[in-house]
Design a protein with these regions (language model features):
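Non-membrane alpha-helical structural segments and their capping/turn regions in soluble enzymes
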Residues: 121, 125, 152, 156-163, ...
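C-terminal extensions of enzymes
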Residues: 1-15, 23-32, 39-40, 143-149, ...
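Surface-exposed helix-capping loop/turn segments at secondary-structure junctions
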Residues: 172-182, 246, 352-364
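Glycine-rich phosphate/ribose-binding loops and adjacent secondary-structure elements
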Residues: 163, 172, 176, 184-305
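Glycine- and acidic
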Residues: 148-152, 156, 216-222, 331-334
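Hydrophobic alpha-helical packing residues
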Residues: 21, 162-169, 209, 238, ...
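Non-catalytic, usually N-terminal nucleic-acid engagement modules in DNA/RNA processing proteins
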Residues: 1-182, 296-299
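Conserved, mostly hydrophobic/aromatic
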Residues: 21, 54, 89, 131, ...
Length: 379
């Protein structure tokens, strides 16, 4: 269940209720692709850094250890020791990124495993069964994520097929939730809007899938190489056609500024591997902009990454020490850097929510959109 508590322009402050708790929105979901955040970050750590929702990947968990194994272990929450809300993606993005290894039909997709090359079939029903076995709170509908750019006629046909697939997802999902031995009988289902960068197809597809009674709706297929302004233009085109009373999820986005601009356009949920990936390469976020901790100038810097930050890294260690760990290839460096960046993203969302509560989001947007993505000028 989703409830809008307050609005400022199109930006929404709300709550989303699921089997494992109440989520305060807007929210950033921390990405644990294979049931763990890369960087030796545990479920216990996620609680400490303010994570509300954990996201895991259907494709990867289906291949290893197998969704049947996870089901026998009591579901993904119990398996990874996370008792909060969880979303699983449909596996579609990963399957369709295997462009040379897959074949698409009306029934679904046959593809070769990236692990051992064996042929695997996944369609709407299979995706729903896997996600039911995982027991997530939010399952995502199976969709085709087309490459940008792709020919108009191909994208149109893909949108039509994805709309048909959604109806099959809903039917299978309802059936699975009704089984007596299902892992999470309260699992919710989000539909996904596609259409490449063609605004008319995006609008048509959104209107079609809005006719199906999903628990929420996502905008997929963006942040895959198109210019940032094109992404914003697509959101602007689609958002007026998204149901007001349902949560909106912008998949795979993005930078801090992307998130602020997404919130301004009416988006409630975000996810991205960027904070953890950037951390592993030494790019860290602060409220004055980004820093590359590997730079020589931090060799004798006694300050924390960000003096205003309360993450485990900033509470205890200097920039000089973290730089040393990264350049020495120590595993602790990756862990501390990832914890910092994820804490920053969760703190960003908390401050966005506070600004919406106080009616000052437009001021927050003016101050931080753009700034947080640029290199820090304080040095």
């Amino acid at each position: 269940m989703f409830k809008v508590l307050k609005q400022e322009g199109r930006a929404r402050r709300g709550t989303f209720t699921c089997a494992h708790g109440v989520v305060q929105t807007p929210v950033f979901m921390n990405v644990g692709t294979q049931g763990a955040i890369k960087g030796a970050v545990s479920a216990h750590d996620l609680k400490e850094i303010g994570c509300q929702v954990e996201l895991s990947n259907t494709y990867h968990l289906h291949l290893r250890p197998g969704d049947g194994v996870v089901r026998q272990m009591g579901g993904l929450h119990k398996f990874m020791g996370w008792d909060g809300p969880m979303l699983t993606d449909s596996g579609g993005f990963q399957v369709f990124s295997l462009s040379g290894l897959r074949k698409i039909t009306e029934e679904g997709v046959t593809f070769a495993s990236h692990i051992d090359g064996r042929r695997i079939f996944m369609g709407p029903e299979e995706s729903m069964r896997i996600q039911s076995n995982l027991g997530s709170d939010i399952a995502m509908a199976f969709d085709e994520c087309v490459e940008n750019p792709s020919p108009y006629e191909y994208v149109k046909a893909s949108c039509e097929r994805t709309a048909r697939w959604l109806e099959r997802c809903v039917a299978e999902h309802d059936k699975l939730n009704g089984l007596s031995d299902t892992v999470n009988p309260q699992q919710q289902l989000f539909g996904i809007n596609q259409g490449g960068t063609y605004a008319d197809l995006r609008v048509w597809h959104m209107e079609e899938i809005a006719k199906v009674n999903c628990d929420g709706y996502a905008i997929g297929g963006l942040a895959v190489g198109e210019p940032t302004q094109v992404m914003y233009d697509i959101i602007d085109a689609v958002e007026p056609h998204m149901p007001r009373e349902k949560p909106r999820y912008l998949m795979g986005v993005g930078t801090p500024s992307n998130i602020i601009e997404g919130v301004a356009r009416g988006i409630d949920f975000f996810d991205c591997v960027m904070p953890a990936r950037n951390a592993r390469h030494g790019k860290l976020y602060t409220w004055q902009g980004t820093i590359n901790i590997k730079n020589e100038k931090y060799k004798l810097d006694e300050r924390p990454i960000d003096p205003t930050c309360s993450c485990p890294a900033c509470r205890s260690f200097s920039r000089a020490y973290l730089r040393h760990l990264l350049t020495a290839g120590e595993m602790l460096a990756m862990r501390l850097a990832v914890l910092h960046n994820l804490h920053f993203y969760n703190e960003l969302m908390a401050r966005i929510r506070e600004s919406l509560d106080s009616g000052t989001f437009s001021d927050f947007r003016a101050q931080y959109s753009g700034l947080l993505d640029r290199p820090c000028q304080e040095d």
